[in-house]
Amino acid sequence: MKKKIYAALAFALYATTFHAQQIYELSAPAKEKTIYTGHLKMGGSNPSGGNISVNSYYMSIDGKPVIPVMGEFHFTRYPRAQWEQEIVKMKAGGVNVLPTYIFWGLHEEEEGKFCWSGNKDLRHFIELCKKHDMPVIVRIGPFCHGEIRNGSIPDWLFARPVDVRSNQPLYLSYVKRLYGEIGRQLQGLYYKDGGPIIGCQLENEMQHSASPWGVNYPGEPLDFTVASYDIDYAMIGVSVMDKKVTTAELGEEHMRTLKRMAQEEGIITPFYTATGWGNAAVIDNEAIPVTSAYTYPFWEEPRMSPFCMFKDIHRVPDYAPVRYDAERFPSFCAEMGAGIQMIYRRRPIVTARAAQALMIRTLGSGSNGIGYYMYHGGSTPLRQDK
């Protein structure tokens, strides 16, 4: 009898406690997404009737929304004889867009003497991409960074009275000549011609980053690969820059000039891109400002990455503040540090598990384009005279 009484009391106490509990409700409603169309001066068609368009949220190919999965492969850093098999493997791995840098300093080691043969045969590489239906984004510089000497500005140019990455007419004349050479190599291979080239990146991290002299030459200033008026904004690597850029108009003018010169030399693609992170210069409504996420940056000391947390990345891009209205452009994270350069004092190893987590976090945060930088490894070649 006592056992029954104790059991009844215990049940009554449990029921009273249960009903007395405060019930909380968690709600995380998604903000209704407004998709803008028609404001971006980009898009194009090919001879077979295909078309590419872009709105404020995503890219469409032949009228269907797509998520570009970009895999970076620098052809000049890998043997020509193996290019084709590597392109095929990348496609089998799920890559549907291949971006590649055109490193000025490798193609014009001596002033006026351009090399487009052997492992530097740009045209052959793009033709192989066409053969295997691999869309391409050409990153034409002139400054590339790309973890290469001078950001790929040729050594000989520093012996001339030029202000690199500036609006100086002399510097721009050298860039114009470079673009002319690139344009001739790519003739007939653009999307409008039935070729694989769907995009073109202009410059790299304009008014944000310079080639990492501070890494390669410890103690040296950061003023060798940046315009004289932008020295105060030169950083070694990708980072947050929240100070006001007082020379912003000069940077934006420079980007517009580069686009105009590229088009004059025949480099005409459905869309153009510019690295938009860290308050860098962009071309409003005329180029997609792509973003990045480096979880193992060699230019910083090891620390917890901020890129483990989900957020509305379309509204607040990584490495904000930025110099554009993020919600009027699609979020394409073009440089996700799935691979990274090693230096003597910092040798990060990016595991496949870490790269996968970064991709899931970025897509889950609302990005509609991801880019593995790097997807394919390689080694920077020595100078021909070495």
Question: For each predicted feature, which ranges?
Answer:
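Bacterial Sec-dependent N-terminal signal peptides
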Residues: 1-22
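Active-site-adjacent "subsite" loops/lids of carbohydrate-active enzymes
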Residues: 144-186
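Active-site neighborhood of glycoside hydrolase catalytic domains
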Residues: 174-273, 277
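Catalytic-core region of carbohydrate-active enzymes that cleave or remodel glycosidic bonds
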Residues: 252, 257-273, 302-385
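N-terminal carbohydrate-binding accessory modules
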Residues: 21-97, 127
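Aromatic-lined substrate-binding rim segments of carbohydrate-active enzymes
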Residues: 83-151, 155-156, 259, 263
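Short, well-ordered coil/turn segments that N-cap beta-strands
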Residues: 67, 94-96, 130-136, 191-198, ...
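Conserved, mostly hydrophobic/aromatic
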Residues: 63, 90, 98, 129, ...
